[in-house]
């Protein structure tokens, strides 16, 4: 029988989970991080410290549309696992495998290649400004006479 974590293929599936399932998912995610980092190395404590907030963010936002900008990539292992990279997480740090930091080349969910502290604020501001510049312009046909 698949674990709850193994049944998650897309982060939007988390939005349908109840509190008990979210708690179980966080625990399974935590165990996965411990399992892999004990063999492959990596950032254990910082990643374990962000499991619950990662689950909460994925429950409440749609990162196909919304953007998350992690300040430091070594806090994002749960995010990597829950955004479609669980099956490949065993390759953490290997050549051609999952990177230990966020990488826009690795996943469309990695919106910023975080690596160092205190870069998220300026990156998020830049993204916000760019989204403001890209206006959505509706081309209205004959519906204007009915409004």
Where are these regions (language model features)?
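Cofactor-binding active-site loop characterized by glycine-rich and histidine/acidic residues
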Residues: 43-147
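Cofactor-/ligand-binding subdomain signature composed of acidic, glycine-rich
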Residues: 1-36
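Compositionally biased, intrinsically disordered low-complexity segments
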Residues: 17, 36-37, 56, 140
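Glycine- and acidic
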Residues: 10-13, 34-42, 106-113
